[in-house]
Amino acid sequence: MKKLLVPLISLCLMAASVAARADAVETLRDFIRDVKTGRAQFTQVVTSPDGVKKKSSSGTFEFARPNRFRFAYAKPFEQLIVGDGQKVWIFDADLNQASSRKFSSALGATPAALLAGGALDKDFDLAVLPMRDGLDWAQATPKQKDGAFKSVALGFRGKDLAVLDIHDAFGQHSVLTFSQLATGINFAADAFRFTPPAGADVIEQ
């Protein structure tokens, strides 16, 4: 009887573990469906394909679904990426240069589109990953294989998004770590609008 009891206990524990991890995809779906607005600080580390070179940056990320977001990079230099639902603007303060593209062509099935409220199950294959670093992980892989990135793993601490772990089509590895996440924010009507500064070079594609 004891010999049978141990395998039964092991099977129960394994089943409980799988059930807990399976919640990561549901947590992602809940986050996309229920969290309409948010703001967080972020740090980003990009590693080159050979794994040698690393670039670090930091700033603030804001979003308001559907299809509005703002990445404001503060360090090591100022850069702004704004999606207003119609266009995506990139502004480089050092060069005083702004460029824009249509929202759909700029993002497609990308992590930014996913966070801004893209068609989750339509655009991505979802899978549960093993727990690591104290986070529950879900992986989103674009169904279209000719895009700019291969996959993104989203790490959740409870119901809060904590990490984006991105592998792009060029072999780069980017990790965005979020902190001080606040949700349910009432943004001003023009919070995700961008107007190029006077004198800036403007490139529209």
What are the roles of these predicted feature ranges?
Residues 1-4:
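Positively charged n-region of N-terminal signal peptides that target proteins for export
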Residues 7-16:
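Bacterial N-terminal signal peptides
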Residues 18-54, 67, 196-205:
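N-terminal leader/targeting segments and the immediate start of mature chains
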Residues 32, 107-121:
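Short, solvent-exposed helix-to-loop capping segments enriched in aromatics
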Residues 35-37, 56-58, 64-66, 76, ...:
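Extracytoplasmic
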Residues 43-49, 72-74, 91-93, 141-143, ...:
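A generic structural motif
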Residues 60-109, 174-175:
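An acidic-aromatic
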Residues 99, 119-125, 129-205:
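Gly/Pro-enriched, hydrophobic low-complexity segments
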